[in-house]
C-alpha cells in the first residue's frame, strides 16, 4: 500500500511539473501577445485616469467621455504637431549632418589619449559595414512594431470603453473564496499604475520644458530635439536620464568644450532635481520603486524582449510589487506558522 501511494505521489508530482513546464513554454511562445496585452492595459489605465476626470466635471457617460478624451488628445497632438513638427524635422536633418562630425571629433579626442586608443579602434571596428548589416532588417521590424502598436491602441480603447465587463470576467474565473480579495487587488493595481503614470507624465513634461528652456538660454544646438529626447527618456528611470544627456552634451561639443561643460552641468543639476525632488513629490502617493529593482527589471526585460521590454518594465514592476505585497507577503509569509 505504501509503495502504491508513493507511486501515485510520484506520478502526481511528475504531472504537475510537466504541466508547469508546458505552461512556461506556452507563455514564452506567446510573450509578444502578452506584451501587447499588458501594454494595452497600461494605455487603458492612462485613458481611464483622464476619463474619470472628465466624468467628474461633466455628466457624460463613459463612451461619450472616452470619445471626448480621444478627441482632446487628437486635437492637442495635432496642435503640437503643427507647432513643433516642422522645427523637429529641420533639427533631425541637422542632426544627420552633425553626427558624422561628432563621431569624428570624439574619435580625434580618443586618439589623442594613448590610454583610450584601443577604445577608439574598437569603436571604429564596430561601425564598419559588417557591424551595420543587422540594420538591414530595420524596415521589417518597424512594420511589425507599427502593427503591434495599432493592436495595442485598439485593445486599449476597447478596455477603456468597458473596463467593468473585463473586471467581472477576471473575478469570475477566480475561485469563489478569493473573489473579494481579487477585486481589492485589481483596485490597488489600477490605483498604483494610474498614480505612477500620472506622476511620470507630469515629470516627463516638466523635464521637457525645463530642458528646452535651459538649452535655449545656453544657446545649445538642436534644443527642441534634445529636450524631447530627455522628456521621453524620463519614462525609463535610472537608464533614460543618463542616456538622454549624451545627445545635448555631444552636440554642444561641436561648438565648444565650454558649451559642452555648461550643458553637462545643467543636465546633471536638472537630473538630480528630477530624481530627488520632482519624481518623489509626484509619486509620493503611489508605490515606491527601489532603483535596484527598477534597473534589474529594465535590464532583464530588455535582454529578453528588447526596447518594448525596457519601456514596459517599470509599469510591470509596479503591478508585481502590489501583487507581492498583497499576495505573497500578507497571504503567505505573514501567516507562516
Q: What kind of feature is each model-predicted range?
A:
Residues 31-39, 217-228, 256-262, 289-294, ...:
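Membrane-water interface of transmembrane alpha-helices in multipass transporters/channels
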Residues 260-337:
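Hydrophobic alpha-helical transmembrane segments of membrane transport and translocation systems
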Residues 60-69, 116, 120, 179-182, ...:
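Membrane-interface starts of transmembrane alpha-helices
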Residues 12, 142-253, 257-265:
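Alpha-helical transmembrane segments and their immediate interhelical loop/hinge regions
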Residues 1-83, 318, 322-325, 329-337:
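Anchoring transmembrane alpha helix of integral membrane proteins
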Residues 6, 50-58, 64-71, 79-151, ...:
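Juxtamembrane membrane-interface segments in integral membrane proteins
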Residues 29, 33-37, 46-53, 57, ...:
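Membrane-spanning helices that line or support transport/gating and their immediate boundary helices
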Residues 40-44, 75-76, 156, 228-242, ...:
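Hydrophobic transmembrane alpha-helices
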Amino acid at each position: 500500500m505504501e509503495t502504491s501511494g508513493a507511486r501515485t505521489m510520484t506520478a502526481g508530482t511528475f504531472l504537475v511539473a510537466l504541466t508547469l513546464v508546458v505552461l512556461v513554454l506556452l507563455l514564452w511562445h506567446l510573450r509578444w501577445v502578452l506584451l501587447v496585452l499588458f501594454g494595452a492595459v497600461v494605455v487603458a489605465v492612462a485613458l481611464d485616469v483622464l476619463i474619470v476626470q472628465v466624468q467628474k466635471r461633466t455628466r457624460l457617460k463613459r463612451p461619450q467621455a472616452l470619445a471626448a478624451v480621444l478627441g482632446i488628445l487628437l486635437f492637442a497632438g495635432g496642435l503640437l504637431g503643427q507647432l513643433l513638427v516642422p522645427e523637429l524635422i529641420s533639427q533631425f536633418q541637422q542632426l544627420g549632418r552633425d553626427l558624422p562630425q561628432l563621431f569624428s571629433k570624439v574619435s580625434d579626442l580618443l586618439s589623442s589619449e594613448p590610454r583610450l586608443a584601443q577604445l577608439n579602434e574598437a569603436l571604429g571596428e564596430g561601425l564598419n559595414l559588417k557591424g551595420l548589416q543587422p540594420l538591414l532588417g530595420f524596415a521589417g521590424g518597424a512594420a511589425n512594431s507599427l502593427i503591434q502598436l495599432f493592436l495595442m491602441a485598439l485593445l486599449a480603447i476597447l478596455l477603456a470603453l468597458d473596463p467593468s465587463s473585463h473586471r467581472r470576467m477576471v473575478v469570475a474565473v477566480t475561485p469563489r473564496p478569493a473573489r473579494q480579495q481579487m477585486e481589492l487587488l485589481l483596485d490597488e493595481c489600477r490605483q498604483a499604475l494610474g498614480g505612477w503614470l500620472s506622476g511620470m507624465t507630469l515629470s516627463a513634461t516638466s523635464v521637457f520644458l525645463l530642458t528646452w528652456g535651459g538649452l535655449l538660454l545656453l544657446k545649445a544646438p538642436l534644443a527642441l530635439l534634445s529636450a524631447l529626447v530627455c522628456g521621453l527618456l524620463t519614462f525609463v528611470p535610472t537608464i533614460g536620464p543618463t542616456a538622454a544627456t549624451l545627445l545635448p552634451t555631444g552636440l554642444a561639443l561641436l561648438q565648444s568644450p565650454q558649451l559642452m561643460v555648461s550643458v553637462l552641468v545643467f543636465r546633471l543639476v536638472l537630473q538630480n532635481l528630477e530624481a530627488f525632488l520632482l519624481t518623489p513629490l509626484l509619486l509620493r502617493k503611489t508605490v515606491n520603486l527601489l532603483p535596484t529593482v527598477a534597473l534589474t527589471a529594465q535590464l532583464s526585460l530588455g535582454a529578453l524582449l528588447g526596447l518594448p521590454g525596457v519601456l514596459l518594465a517599470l509599469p510591470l514592476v509596479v503591478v508585481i510589487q502590489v501583487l507581492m505585497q498583497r499576495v505573497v507577503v500578507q497571504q503567505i509569509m505573514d501567516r507562516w506558522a
